[in-house]
């Protein structure tokens, strides 16, 4: 089996909304204000007001991602995207979440399990 990337994805994030400590860790809502994706078979934008991460940082400092978004392809199809995963919450991530820095590609690691759904026959 040969794995090939479907796309590269970027998101413009709002400052997190702190929900606070709960039984699973420190929960926050990180809203996505646009972004995009591009690859050999899929390209387009992230619909504004349709995406967020319900992030939890546990007592070990591991971030647990729960992201949902609506993608709009370059040819007008809508795709629901959801992924769960884990995020290494290092100094770069902490600074970005605090609004005092950026975390660029390659400055942390995260592992996700994506799922996508659409009713558009071109992308089933």
Residue ranges and their predicted role:
Residues 1-124:
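Beta-strand-enriched cores of mature, soluble protein domains
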């Amino acid at each position: 089996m040969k794995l090939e990337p479907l796309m590269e994805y970027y998101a413009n994030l709002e400052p997190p909304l702190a929900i606070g400590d709960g039984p699973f860790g420190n929960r926050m809502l990180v809203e996505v204000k646009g972004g995009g994706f591009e690859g050999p078979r899929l390209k387009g934008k992230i619909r504004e007001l349709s995406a967020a991460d319900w992030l939890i940082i546990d007592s070990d400092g591991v971030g647990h991602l729960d992201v949902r978004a609506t993608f709009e392809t370059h040819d007008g199809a809508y795709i629901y995207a959801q992924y769960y995963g884990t995020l290494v919450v290092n100094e770069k991530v902490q600074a970005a979440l605090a609004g005092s820095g950026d975390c660029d590609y390659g400055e942390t690691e995260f592992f996700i399990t994506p799922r996508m759904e659409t009713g558009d026959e071109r992308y089933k």
